[in-house]
Every structure is written in structure tokens, then in C-alpha cells.
Design a protein with these regions (language model features):
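Active-site-adjacent betaalpha module
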Residues: 1-3, 33-41, 66-185
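N-terminal nucleotide-binding beta1-loop-alpha1 segment
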Residues: 4-9
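Short acidic, Gly/Ser-rich segments with clustered Asp/Glu that frequently serve as metal-coordination loops
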Residues: 10-16
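Short, glycine/acidic-enriched loop or turn micro-motifs at the edges of active sites
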Residues: 11, 53, 154
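Short glycine-enriched, charge-decorated loop/helix-capping segments at active-site entrances
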Residues: 17-24, 63-69, 99
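A short alpha/beta connector and helix-capping loop motif
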Residues: 17-50
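Short glycine-enriched loops at secondary-structure junctions
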Residues: 50-52, 100-101
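Metal-dependent catalytic neighborhoods of phosphoester/phosphodiester hydrolases
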Residues: 56-60
């Protein structure tokens, strides 16, 4: 079985408090289409969504980034068309809060994947070189086959985005896809 993990495609990361901006806006249609496709196929779909408490001065990101994805705020809402897909299909999509870069860190993601005998994980979302990267590394270390949809990933750092795509392919053995077609970088 396959799984799609949609990482941090929220208002705060697209246009809000820690915005990727235009690169994230540009993937809106594609990320919604890929999510719809996985739901339709009956694959396991996970919304891995960053959550923070504004007063948590001990969280390591507190020193690195402005407050973002604060619990109970509109910044944590899924962005645009992905929000529409989620609302229409939420009974078939697993929502998972995460507090670290990797969707595996401190969550039950590994357990959820193993219970469903998932062997192949497809990754989409933001930021390519932060949360998508750390999730991919943890997936690799757990023995999952990794597919990254390059046309569904974005970062506020263009060089970091390109570096991460190369790292996925060259160091993690991940398959990269654009329009569902494998590519080589």
C-alpha cells in the first residue's frame, strides 16, 4: 500500500506568519489534485500539520523563526484548494499534529503506516528543505520507499529547495516526480 503525507501546507506557511510565498502558491492546484487522486485510489492520506503554542519559549524553533501555526489560529488552517479537498474527504484523511520538523518525530505516523502495511511514502508540501527533508530522512531510516512530488513541494529558499531535491534522489534513493512522471536531477 502507498501513503501520501501532506506536510504543512497551511495559511501561515503559504501567505501568513512564515510565508513561502509565490513558490507555495504556485503548487496549490497540483497539491490538491495529487491529494484528491490518492483519496480516490483508497490510499492512506495524512495531513501532517505543524502546531505551536505561542508561549512555548523552550521549543527549539522559538529562537529560529517568528511565531507560526499557533494552536487555535487561522494560520494553522490548510491553504486554499487543499482545505476544500480536506473538508470534502476528512473522514478518509488522517489529520496529525506535529511539533517538530519531521512528521515522524513524537507522532504515531510510523505506527499508522505499519498498521496499513504501507511500504511506499509519497511526500508533498512545504518547506522542501526543512520539514519535507526531515520527514524523508526519517522515512528512509525506517526503510520506506520514498517518492517526492517535486511539483508539489516548495521553499522560501530556492537554493535549499534544489539542494533538497538532489539530496532526496542521490542520498535517500527517492524517486522524484513531476506530473506523476519520474525525473532525474
Amino acid at each position: 500500500m502507498k501513503a501520501l503525507v501532506v506536510i504543512d501546507y497551511t495559511f501561515d506557511f503559504v501567505e501568513g506568519r512564515l510565508p513561502v510565498g509565490q513558490p507555495a502558491i504556485a503548487i496549490e492546484d497540483r497539491i490538491a489534485a495529487v491529494t484528491r487522486q490518492f483519496v480516490k485510489q483508497g490510499d492512506f492520506v495524512v495531513m501532517a500539520v505543524d502546531v505551536h503554542d505561542e508561549q512555548d519559549a523552550l521549543h527549539p524553533e522559538h529562537k529560529l523563526f517568528p511565531p507560526h501555526n499557533i494552536r487555535g489560529t487561522s494560520g494553522r488552517e490548510l491553504y486554499g484548494k487543499l482545505s476544500e479537498v480536506y473538508e470534502a474527504e476528512k473522514e478518509r484523511i488522517y489529520w496529525m499534529d506535529k511539533t517538530r520538523y519531521s512528521a515522524f518525530a513524537g507522532t504515531d505516523l510510523d505506527l499508522q503506516l505499519r498498521m496499513r502495511a504501507v511500504q511506499e511514502i509519497h511526500l508533498v508540501g512545504v518547506c522542501t528543505d526543512i520539514c519535507v527533508l526531515h520527514t524523508a530522512v526519517d522515512a528512509y531510516n525506517r526503510g520506506f520507499r520514498i517518492v517526492v512530488h517535486a511539483d508539489c513541494a516548495a521553499s522560501f529558499n530556492p537554493q535549499g529547495h534544489e539542494w533538497a531535491l538532489q539530496h532526496f534522489q542521490r542520498s535517500l534513493g527517492a524517486e522524484l516526480r513531476i506530473d506523476d512522471q519520474p525525473i532525474t536531477i
